[in-house]
Amino acid sequence: SITGVWKGFNSTKAEAADNDTITLRICNWEEYIDEGGWNADETIDLESTDIRGDNSMVDDFVQWYYKTYGKKVNVEYSCLGTNEELYNMLTLGDEYDLICPSEYMFMKLMTEGWLEPFSDEFYDTGIKENYYAKGVSPFIKQTFDNNTINGEPWSKYAAGYMWGVTGIIYNPEDVTKQEASTWKIINNDKFRRMITVKDNVRDTMFAAIGAIKSDKLRSQDFIRQADYTDKLAEEMNDTSKDTVDEVLEYLQQVKDNVYSFETDSGKIDAITGKISAGYQWSGDAVYIMQQAEANDVELNFAIPEECTNMYFDGWAMLKSGINGNSEKKKAAEAFVNFVSMPENAVRNMYYIGYTSVISGGQSPVIYDYLKWNYGLESLMEEDDTISEADAIDYSLGYFFSGVSNDSRYILRTSKAQTEGMLSAQYPTEEVMHRSAIMQYFDNDETARINQMWINVRCFNIHNVPVWVWIAVAAAIVAVIVLRIADVIRHKKI
């Protein structure tokens, strides 16, 4: 569903017909970019700068593009709800220039040849306006460079936007951290009808594999392997028939244990106390904890010890949209750079709650924003129950500089934040060591897991009463007996 279209820079019919006006068609997720209109008291006053969102990000881009390049751009900005909806729109002939799919979808689009590669110029850190190349986290850059499709790196066709991990949001009054730190919680009958899982096959299958293989994944023999991260990815992306059958059986049990399979309702269910725990993406977990805190409810976030799913949304250009138009491609790449400007990355993080792939490079803005949210001094100013006695060092060098334990990026924070919003928004390097990315599945794998999911969501053999099985067996026996009798009768004739 299209929820909005921006047409910027005094876009009139005359300008639309003007050959000097570039039309840029962008498709993103709903409520996934700063739409402006901040209240007067919403200024983010950082050590390095003050940040506000008076206008929408799209309108600000239109103004910036004209000021920077002397060209008018008309942005047609559309929103969709799911990756599958986006793919269906593309196959039906809808045309966009720039889209923001999740990692598995841009892998699929790469495989099928839909995407336009980014220019070499886009990654030139010597160009002032290349905010993405200059500011992307070294950790994220390495991930996009090292992951490949058909021998080509993600970074050739995709630039990161937001990222995160998956885990369990939980109420510490009902659930211990240890109980929440394993995927086996989704089938723990102690929390029967008190926990939610995601209503999509990829996320919930990931959790099921983590639970089924829990003992193996947590064993020291497995963890100490030299190629541990590769082996972990193999295990979590196992779509063999035996594993999928095992996942089916496990999820049929889970179906009887959970409160619901949900996409969005789990947020309010956690905040209002309808559930004690729920599978969540870290970005949504931050939002849930913020809302709960506003209602004086404490919720925490745990990242399972078996493995966590590292996910991305990334900008990608479509061949069918760009269609060889160099000016349009320049505008699309400029939009990615504009939203990657540290101040704009902060605006988007503040507005949507997810974590930008931008660490800022030489700019201190992103780390200043981190301190503004989670630094001990800021926390003590907001809550007089927090003191130096609660202090703990939280190392994020791997994300900001690519150097573990970089003293410039050891955040002094409160211990509570290591189990709360900070841990969801910026997981530690140790957590990321046990992360895996769900790969794009080929047609055979997709058919197998989709059929499994249909069986889980539409039919549960564990719910069938014994008398039904007896009746079915009796009917089968009766059919066989009648068939034999019919054969004998015909032989006699």
What annotation goes with each model-predicted range?
Residues 1-8:
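N-terminal export signals
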Residues 27-43, 48-54, 104-269:
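Extracytoplasmic ligand-binding site segments that recognize negatively charged/polar headgroups
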